[in-house]
């Protein structure tokens, strides 16, 4: 959900938010005033235009105030570009109507000016090739005064491109005017059009006064006003966040820091309470659950009313309608007084009705108020006081805490929530509409029309692209919310099927213009592919296809809006509806592709043209198949891909489940012979369905690997071509020699992977010079070869290219061509085989797909493990592990093979444990889904609690159906149980989720199957599932053996499983070791929530700015990188609004850059927002949230908030232990930070406990001679010396010295520092020993020995060490050093340019040899486009790790 709302729609942004954000930002800006210039943003977050078709489209985007500026590269933003003001950046001042004006500071000075050296675009980026019209983003502001009844005059700065509607929203959000909803804005007594831009209003000038005029209510306006009042009163209540309603979510940063960090004063070390909670100290076995949601008792605000609901006297009878009555309300105040309220066109008043008597006349004395808040304040003093308290508490919270998130975030644990009377909640629950759809022209939304219309918006200029992407994002967010609600209604039995007479599994549904289908093989459609198992995974693969075609974004090619929802064990696919598809049979609709898996095949010239364009990017090979009449039919996609021309004339494609080629490692095919290496590893594995496909990331990595080989081989042959008197024999030997060299090189690299990380990092520095020499030699050889080619050796050059193509397996003999035929191994499809050596050769196509699958196992999996050996950004839970696997193109079905490799490496123990936990959770999910389908709604909570007992406990698990449920009469309300008696046996033995019949269902026909499951039987099923699905032997038969053998924490398993399948448990401490009663009871299951999968729309221009900024950072140009990433954040705010995952990534990077540029206060302000955003959009216990907390603790310490820094680290450590346990490299980093700060506070014993644990982990994961270990020894020595234990300190510092000496040599600064530390410690130890000897011999000190000095460290030295631990090193460098660094950078770029020259030379020779370079260039361009398309969102979320690494090393 985007932040924009209709002027009358207040549920997306909490009332008062925008105004509060403005004031919050003002505080933050003042805190860093004088350091940098403040930048105003106009993200235009409240636009919601309605076009002629009734589709929601957004107004003009991204505007800034400042001087006009047109540049190819982005302008230099000022210091606070990250201020994503939700009130559109309005700078406000309040002017008393009686007093004079107070001049507001000029917040727009010098904004938008271009720096002389900054903002250059990276080569090849879109920023370089397009003139970005930043004029549209930097409009000069205009100041207007707003006069509201009963409020001070408000002065607001606006952009001339903003809409009048945004002033509307601003006033509804401000504290003084938030209780008004029904008003118009007038200038010179002329009412302004809500959708007019300010620049189009002729009378509007600088300093003009706009009047707020109260308007008469209509029924719609009255209902909106009542809903708005309810939202105001519930503003502080976390119930909606726990219930997963209205895109609300939790954040606990302010609870932990007890207010805004920016408002706090620096703390003295002696005034800090630094004692860690018991569950945070090292050695905790099972972390408690309650601290996950701190201070929940005080989370709810004061109660203003007992009841606010619509009256049972609604609707007004005819005579009262004629008197202007709109609706009736019923209120019970805190004084226990009961009132019936009438809403009329003039406002609200108390009438004389009672619960039994209808008397609509006004009460005596009558009091009419235009605002319901005013009326309630008049009749109830308690309401007035409570409402003021709510407003005050709301304004103390950070603005980001109240803004709606783009998508709903669900909590896996919830406290007991009080269920209150709420008429609006009741209305929403049983309404067939979705919230505010009735406020949109045309009533019910036409989702398909909206989704397609937004994609058709123009995209030539930056403002047009921003508008288009913003509209796509908004409509997509609304569609996901509607689809999720509809899917839950379908499973809960609240939607009538369009084919109610058929079996429950075969039923389909239409709700709110969305089509819903269940994940079952309804008509044996997938019989040959795996039945229900294939039908269950098909929607997920289809969603992948929709994602990549949307990313390619070919104009004229349309996909359906698609969302996949897992809920209560069922998989539901929600799709938008193609116009006209329900009016005719499918056979009549399809004009391209096949509806029967290749028996009949159709093609269409328009589809061929569109899909050929997309295929260039997706590496899909056009191919021909035979139809039923043995005629060749050309296709540019898989056979299953269907093309349908809708009644709207658009060309739709659907059923994209086979967009990418099959994975032959999981298909047993007679014609496929895998390599011996794969066979030895157990491949091929027969999967339970035949839809296994390779990932797009893998194909890109494979093509890139082959292209690098192609360049190298061509370069070697060109050198040979230029050598004089070269024999034919030498030429024939060159290729095998090269392959042997490459093989040796790969073996060497794999051997090096086992060496300590430090040696690897040292050796990484060395090859740079060798690579430079090699590149230079290649360039020289190619230059000579080119001169020969140009004169007489074109035939020989063509032969070189031909050999290189043959060596890498190119589809074409004389061109580098790698594309894939997705149908190459499909059963029942008859291919048209081409000539040998051409791209239409079926044999070549099959070999290529086999090679890609082999590349995954032989290269990508080892590369994945090697990358994580350095522990630079280690996965923390199953989700981050899965994301990392996917980024390497590795499917999760290879998890068993990954686990086998990890088990052989002790230094990857933590990753092995996380992978085993993820595999157990996924296997259990397969079993749970069938288990849930065989459970009646009456027994859901009992069945779920019984399942959790079987999974997590060893005590008694006898299922006890509660007496309440036992006495309920059985109901057949749920359609999925209508046919249980005759169809249950089939369903019980069926395999909807992909588990084998024997392993995932009891095979019983009774709907009480769930009562038969025991811990032993469940773990046996999990073992069978692990073996059959992942080919991995799970060596445990109970939770105890899993805990003892693999080190899994039960609380971590509970969390992972609840998140995976959508269970919400009660927030309390669970005793998993209980031997007397079950751990979980049915009252512990609070709710079940949907698990939603959908595509994430992109912000392309923001992505380009971001990646260019990353490139600048990696070059050490922090200031320029800061400016570019600030601009990226600005654009993200325009597309996504202020709350989004990618905005959080930008904020984290900007905070780190601010810190490096010396502005710790600015870093603190930005990082605080990053933490809140991560908690809101990712989750309070998400791995990203932990990372944000650790960053914030560093900046807090740098700003003097020592106690807060410790609290933040304690929170981060608790979350880490909850998710994955203490045995993790990141815990070592957190413990080192905690130890240092405790050391600074003089808590030496506590400090020693944490640093000892960090040392133990560092030795385990980095090796005993690693630099991390040396630093840990040094910290221990410092702490022990402060405790007076000089002997131990001396021993530890000796270890430090030994490691530094062996790693960096005796002359290195670190070694010399350690030697000096050793000298001082030795001196102090000798001194102490003399004193001790003197006391022992004489009973007292007799000699005049100097005192022992134990100097506590200064805060500055502690901060320096914290920086070092966290990878930040500030270095003072001389002019001589600058010159040296510059020469090194130039050398680096020279090497890069040499490589580029090699590539360019090869390409030119290829072109010369073929006399046609178009195809090759096109292939390479497509490869580049493919890289740009691949995972742009993932890059934006995770890509900053590389840049942060560069930041750290710089």
From Swiss-Prot:
Family annotation (SUPFAM superfamilies):
Hypothetical protein c14orf129, hspc210 (SSF103107), TPR-like (SSF48452)
Q: Which CDD domains match?
A: CLU-central
Coiled-coil positions are none
Residues of the region (Disordered) are 1-126, 266-287, 725-775, 959-1011, 1410-1450
An example of a Gene Ontology cellular component annotation for this protein is: cytosol
Q: Where is the Clu domain?
A: 425-667
- Disulfide bond as UniProt keyword: no
Which residue intervals are annotated with compositional bias (Basic and acidic residues) in the record? Answer: 725-734, 743-765, 1417-1428
What this protein is called in its record is Protein clueless
Lineage in the entry?
Answer: Eukaryota, Metazoa, Ecdysozoa, Arthropoda, Hexapoda
